[in-house]
Amino acid sequence: KNTAPAIALMALHIEKINPKGIMGVFPADHLIVGHKKFQQAIINAIHLAKKDDALITMGVQPTFPSTAYGYIQFDEKSEEDHIDGYGVVTFAEKPHQDLAKRFIESGDFLWNAGIFIWQVSTLFSGIEKHMPDLNEHIENIRERLNKKESFHDIWKQISPESIDYGLLEKTKNIFVIKAKFDWNDLGSWNAVYDYFMKAKDENIIRGKGYVQSGQQNLILSPDKFTAIIGVDNLVVINTDDATLVVSKRSEERRVGKE
């Protein structure tokens, strides 16, 4: 169903516990280093969410012109309360290389970390204004939840929608916290490889494995012994019921749906 319906459904559950509740949305495949800085960024986001009845997102200072991430342009003159919170000018999709370089050179673009903080009431107001179809379904689900009835038939009718496209890019009451913690999206095997410390020939072995005459390989195999001979830039992942073998040059994140 994509992010908007899922976030809205969770907000309904939070609202039931506390109508004035604040919710956070955190992607599961992100690496965050610097827990105290991360904690402070969340505190700052909560402050703005309450003070301005606003939607808050997190932006990370780019370290290179990545084409794998979306970007957020912020208004440098609009800092709120000296807590690294800025008004959002625009969202930008994953750019081509030249555009990514221009983003970096401008100094007012951040990587979009996909982390969101807001009051559930603010979220529902935004959905009501900018996503009327989803809002109608959410209202029906709210009624079912109040009656402790199943809402699965309504859920099936909801069209997949992204919270970014459906709401964040349309609303004006949105701020970005300029994060100071280290961040990495582990959404590709190259990102996972970059995270680990390298051994001889820049190979990484976690679990049972061996590499001979090969460089920059990644083996994650807790139980099965895996050997790589004469091959470079390979990823081998062993689990109880499956084995994945893929080139690091490939950015494919999934194997077919069948």
Regions found by a protein language model. Name each.
Residues 18-21, 51-55, 67-68, 85-86, ...:
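Short coil/turn connectors at secondary-structure junctions
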Residues 74-110, 144-145:
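A short, charged helix-loop
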Residues 29-36, 85-91, 109-114, 153-154:
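Flexible, glycine/proline-enriched loop segments at strand-loop-helix junctions
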Residues 23, 89, 108, 115-116, ...:
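A residue-level structural signature of the nucleotidyltransferase/glycosyltransferase Rossmann-like core
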